[in-house]
Amino acid sequence: MKPEETKILASRHLRQEKQREGQAQFKYGSHIHEWFRPKMRKAAQELPAEARIRAIRPAGRKKAKGTVITVGEGRGFVVEHRGEHLVVTASHCLPWLPSGFGIAYSEEHVYRNMLGPLGAAPTVACECLFINPIADVAVVGVPDTQTLSDEADAYRALLEYATPFRITEAPEKSRGFLISLEGEWFGCQVQWMKRIDGPLWVSKPTQPIEGGMSGSPIVSETGNAIGIVAASVMEKGKDAATDEFGASNPRLMRDLPLWLLRTQAMRKQ
C-alpha cells in the first residue's frame, strides 16, 4: 500500500473533514425541484442545561400511531428494531455523509446535537446506521455504548417513552396524512406505480407542504408509516403538489434496508 493511501485510511479526522467539505459543496434545489431545507432553530448550546435532554412522552394523536421528533434542522420518526428505538429520516436532514470506509471508527458515523423533541432544538447524539442519498433515506440509532456511553444514555432517555411507527406498504392510490410545522395532521393523496416499483407520489394536500417538514412520515389511513416527506415540485414559483401526481418521495417498503424491513414484518398488526 502506498504511504499516501495509508494516511487517508488512518486519519479519521481527514476523512470527516473531506466528507463535510463535499456535503457543503452539494446544493439541493433548482427552479423546478425545491427540496425542503428546514428552518433554523435556536442553537442547542444556548439552551439551559435542564432543557438539553428531556424524554419524549406520549401525546394524543388522531391520525398517526407513532412519535415524530426533531432531526437536525428537519424531522424523523421512531421505529423499532430488535427491541431498540431507531429513527428514520430524509438523508438531506443530516449535516454530512458518513465515511464509506469499512474500517472507519464508529464515532465517524456519529452526529452530535441531532435529535430532540418535536419543535425543540436538537441536543442528543445519534449514529448513522444506514444512508441512501439517492433515495434520500437515512436511519439513525443509539451511539456505541462502550466508547460513547453518555451519548447512548442520552439517546435512550430521549426516546424512552416514544411510540414506534409500524411500517407497511402504501396503497397504490389512497388518502394519506402529513404533519404540519404546527404539529397538526392534514390530508393528502398518495399513490405509486406497482409495475415499476416506483416512489410514493404526494399530491392535493389540504394544507401547504412547507420547508421544515423534511423527514416527517407520510402516514396511511390506518396510521402506519408508508413514506418520508422529502421534496416538493415548484413551477413558476408555485407549489405543483395540487396536480394529479405532485412530488415523488421515498416509499418505505422500497427504500428502507432489508434488515429493518424484516423485523417490521414480524410485528403484530
Regions from the PLM with identified roles:
Residues 51-72, 153-160, 181-268:
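Active-site region of chymotrypsin-like
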Residues 34, 41, 45-49, 54-61, ...:
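Catalytic-histidine neighborhood of serine endopeptidases
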Residues 131-141, 172, 195-201:
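Short, surface-exposed linear segments at secondary-structure transitions and domain or protein termini
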Residues 79, 85-89, 115-117, 136-143, 179-181, 203-205, 219-221:
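A generic structural motif
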Residues 28, 36-43, 77-78, 97-98, ...:
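Active-site substrate-binding loop(s) of clan PA
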Residues 95-96, 143-148, 204-212:
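Short solvent-exposed strand/turn elements
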Residues 1-46:
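N-terminal targeting leaders that route proteins to membranes or the secretory/organellar pathways
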